[in-house]
Amino acid sequence: MSARHDGRAPDALRPTVIEPGFVRTATGSALISVGETRVICTASAQESVPRWMAGKGRGWVTAEYGMLPASTGDRKQRDVTRGRPDGRTVEIQRLIGRSIRGVIDFEALGERTIYLDCDVLQADGGTRCASITGAYVALALALERLAGEGRLERIPLNGSVAAVSCGIVDGQAVLDLDYPEDSSAEVDANVVMTGEGGLIEVQATAERTPLSRAHLDELLALAAGGIDHLRGVQQAAIALATAP
């Protein structure tokens, strides 16, 4: 296995740090740094649900995603200036919401909505995966707070969830692509998994050559190893924030 342009082994994540409680005014929050990618994730609770869910005794979790104008090399116009979110933004925020909902016990959540907001401060590849991984920590901290305030009888989580990118670069399967790798990859994939190894979503796109089944299996194995490490980072951040 050859080293990558930044010296990492093919199965190595970028340095990943999650700082819990980054936004004091949020019910739960975290700043996640994955290499040079940085995303602020917040969770806010509202004591109501969408109209179509009212009276069912179930809660809801939804997500929004955005990038600061200077988060990339070229200034990105704000969605509010454009008048609507672009297609990529809509796709990513739906992915974040689906991913987090995969580990929620909606009955235990009760008739309340948790809003997850993921704002990219700096983008160097993997922003959607970093958003999912950080949003889970923000959510877990928000639920701990609600339980501590007596608003929840128990934590309505069925497990943890994290996400990581992987792909084929120069014919080699690699984990956690940064921007230079992502922009030149023959195959680009995003994998969302629970801490127990259950797949929530797999997105894989072959850019120039078809993806073989052998390479797909290799990518999933890489992702599983990466997500196992990310789960440890998540658990450490939650433990730090909830320690007496």
Listing of model-derived features with the role each one plays in the protein:
Residues 81-85, 118-127:
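A short glycine/serine-rich beta->alpha loop
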Residues 87, 108-111, 126-130, 140-144, ...:
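A structural signal for small-residue-enriched, beta-sheet-centric alpha/beta enzyme cores
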Residues 16-19, 25-28, 46-49, 101-103, ...:
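Glycine-rich, charged/polar anion/phosphate-binding loops
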Residues 110-118:
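Short, conserved phosphate-binding/catalytic loop or strand-edge motifs used
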Residues 22, 30-109, 199-221:
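Glycine-rich, flexible beta-strand/loop modules in the N-terminal catalytic cores of phosphate-handling
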Residues 33-35, 137-141:
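Alpha-helix C-terminal capping segments
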Residues 95, 130-138:
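Short amphipathic alpha-helical face segments that pack within enzyme cores
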Residues 1-33:
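Short, Gly/Pro- and small/polar-rich lid/capping loops
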